[in-house]
């Protein structure tokens, strides 16, 4: 089975068995440029993101634990790869496919995503999300988790909250944010999104039950 099909089958089976509606929004793959970059370049033009651009600043906020020196974007797609700061790691990069679950603009095509995954033959982490037509009860989680608010460049606190320690292996973090406000959508729409590590895709296991326990509590 192909990687994307296997991921979707895993999540769809969980959704069917648990009356849930989880979706994939982002995929990340760490890779060796020596072995993969030439194949990626055959997919289209990769354009360097300007160092002082607001886009690069925004992208840096999305990458955990490591600094990045540069980023390259696949044409007009919401698909990038990052170069790492440390010299030994510069041979490696992280490719990210963003915006697979969107309402305000087209998502990357499934055909393109499949071609990328055929080249990479792996997935390092995914963002799994659920969208709600109301604001979740985030504070209900405060008795068990530390809720960290997001601060903008001016230091102002926003409605966005993070759980950076879920106490669950592979469930790296969870973010709650106003999706309608972020994307200029009409009405009320909030997103709960989990970043989940995948140590070994050949033995695919995602902590979806644990994520559901958290989303259920926020939906009460």
List where the protein language model places each region:
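Structured, helix-rich domain cores that form ligand/interaction pockets
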Residues: 1-220
């Amino acid at each position: 089975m192909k990687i994307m099909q296997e991921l979707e089958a895993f999540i769809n089976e969980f959704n069917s068995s648990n009356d849930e509606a989880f979706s994939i929004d982002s995929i990340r793959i760490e890779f060796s440029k020596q072995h993969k970059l030439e194949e990626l370049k055959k997919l289209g033009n990769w354009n360097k993101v300007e160092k002082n651009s607001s886009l690069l600043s925004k992208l840096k906020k999305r990458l955990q634990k490591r600094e990045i020196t540069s980023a390259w974007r696949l044409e007009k797609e919401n698909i990038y790869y990052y170069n790492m700061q440390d010299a030994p790691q510069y041979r490696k990069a992280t490719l990210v496919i963003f915006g697979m679950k969107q309402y305000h603009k087209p998502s990357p095509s499934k055909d393109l995503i499949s071609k990328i995954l055929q080249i990479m033959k792996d997935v390092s982490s995914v963002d799994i999300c659920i969208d709600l037509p109301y604001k979740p009860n985030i504070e209900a989680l405060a008795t068990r988790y530390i809720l960290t608010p997001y601060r903008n460049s001016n230091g102002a606190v926003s409605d966005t909250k993070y759980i950076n320690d879920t106490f669950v292996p592979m469930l790296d973090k969870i973010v709650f944010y106003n999706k309608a406000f972020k994307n200029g959508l009409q009405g009320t729409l909030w997103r709960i999104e989990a970043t989940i590590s995948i140590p070994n895709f050949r033995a695919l296991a995602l902590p979806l039950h644990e994520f559901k326990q958290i989303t259920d509590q926020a939906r009460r």
